Amino acid sequence: MSSRKHLANAIRALSMDGVQQANSGHPGAPMGMADIAEVLWRSHLNHNPQNPEWADRDRFILSNGHGSMLIYSLLHLSGYDLSIEDLKNFRQLHSKTPGHPEYGYAPGVETTTGPLGQGITNGVGMAMAEKALAAQFNREGHDIVDHNTYVFMGDGCLMEGISHEACSLAGTLGLGKLIAFWDDNGISIDGEVEGWFSDDTPKRFEAYGWHVIPAVDGHDSDAINAAIEAAKADPRPSLICTKTVIGFGSPNKQGTHDCHGAPLGAEEIAATKAQLGWEYGAFDIPADVYAGWDAKEVGAEKEAAWNAKFDAYAAAHPELAAEYKRRVNGDLPAEWEEKANTIIADLQANPANIASRKASQNALEAFGAMLPEFMGGSADLAPSNLTMWSGSKSLEANDFSGNYIHYGVREFGMTAIMNGIALHGGFVPYGATFLMFMEYARNAMRMAALMKVQNIQVYTHDSIGLGEDGPTHQPVEQIASLRLTPNMSTWRPCDQVESAVAWKLAIERKDGPSSLIFSRQNLAQQERTQEQVADIAKGAYILKDCEGQPELILIATGSEVELAVEAAAQLTAEGKAVRVVSMPSTDAFDKQDEGYREAVFPSAVTKRIAIEAGIADFWYKYVGFGGKIIGMTTFGESAPADELFKMFGFTTENVVNTAKELLA
């Protein structure tokens, strides 16, 4: 049987070889954390390489994702479907081993990491999901949800502000199944971190309410093992502070930034292997090392034991077991489609002129009763975002059976935590803040789009309609920024019906995030036929039309739709042939077939005006260079909303005059 050190050296060898073959990458962190990884993966991690989707597996996250050869080596050695050829293709086009770990490529990669700090934050979300799912489904004698979340993170993760947001909340909520390892190697790209990172990290985490295990030798297997055992036994989240040597084993580069982000070079690799006693060539792993690492048999036994436990649970609680399966499979309730469509039809039949943020809350009230998988929240703005409904129950450290998270003023942390909740499974997470403060969270929403995970964001107070709070709180360019993000679905509804449709589609969308943008001010409900209600889902549809071919098309979203309707009525009375298109979602419209898009926007009709209280430039795509845009070209001002709309040209008079100029 190979020694622990010999098995850990397999990680070091593969990491050196992979980075050298790619001629780029980060060998230092994998070499430094290899001993920790060997103890965790071989003695503690419950997983099954033959079924990476096993619901009750432990989750492992490499938050310092630049050290990706570490996780690729672990997955390969443990027996996942990741071959030695895949490792040789590290960082190559269309490989399963991209430069940073990406969800959906290599089996066993739980989340995409690389932007530092987001991995630990995803881990907080996964641990929250585990604790909530356990509270909702476990019954006496039947702990079917019972797994840990393990996170490796480096100095960079801890320097990023998001780590404070997430780890603070993790301590407050008592996430005892979360165990993080700090790779305390004292090195970052610029050199020794003591010049820019001198925090007392153990005291920092003690202040959060974490269980802290300081000064663990990251190259002493017995010390690492004892620390993990202590962490698993403590009811608080745990930070294991492991002192490591970056690039461990490299005679000339270990302990320096020279081994952080570049290949070691052929000579140094040879010297390192000699020093480690590793007598094998590039990508050469001997049979005894593979045998020592192989987790397939043990993993299958662990899953089989859990399956037997679940069968007993299903016999005792058949309805709960069926509901658990539905939830973790991500299936909607059987009656969902029919009931949701009825709710939308009823809203159209019973008009209400309300703010779309209130319409959003009403949609939550209607849909929430059918969706126990909802896990809502807000970044300390629930009374403004209107994200709580009658069925909302807040999560508390001692009671996680609820469905609502008070994230505090942590927009970035909230959004990345939601990514972790979505990745874990069993929940449909939604969160909220003012649209302006989407900026704090932008990269986490980009990560949701990149990973194709369901993350529903409610962004309220969507324009200069916010009024007196002024330009610091008035969004201008934010909607365009969201629309320009690949795989982001963005909706800005004009009334309660469009709001409910947007919510329905966001709930049904499993392959990416949704941004639902709502107003502070009341909006007039529009009249629609049944066919028009059905067409809302297409992203843009003809709301008001003329006889025959229009000479002018007015395009509007959200609060500006009623402005377009009023202007069209006045122009029609003056003999103009005008069409009004409500366009709540440009990305949904862009996915429609050419026939539908041509029917809404005939190419022969070039006189077009877009009206939106957001950045104007975005709309040239739809109006063309010959069209006009009534939008924002500057930041807002502090004043009552009515005065601002008038000042910036969002009036019936200005729309009519602009139309006449265009038609002249």
From Swiss-Prot:
Binding residues annotated for thiamine diphosphate, in chain numbering: 66, 114-116, 156, 185, 260, 437
Any Gene Ontology CC annotation: cytosol
MF term (GO), any: metal ion binding
Cofactor(s) needed: Mg(2+); Ca(2+); Mn(2+); Co(2+)
InterPro entries, sorted: THDP-binding (IPR029061), Transketo_C/PFOR_II (IPR009014), Transketolase-like_C_2 (IPR055152), Transketolase-like_Pyr-bd (IPR005475), Transketolase_bac-like (IPR005478), Transketolase_BS (IPR020826), Transketolase_CS (IPR049557), Transketolase_fam (IPR033247)
Coiled-coil region list: none
Residues annotated as the enzyme's active site: 411 (proton donor)
Chain's role: Catalyzes the transfer of a two-carbon ketol group from a ketose donor to an aldose acceptor, via a covalent intermediate with the cofactor thiamine pyrophosphate.
Family that this chain belongs to: Belongs to the transketolase family.
Protein name: Transketolase 1
Species of the source: Aliivibrio fischeri (strain ATCC 700601 / ES114) (Vibrio fischeri)
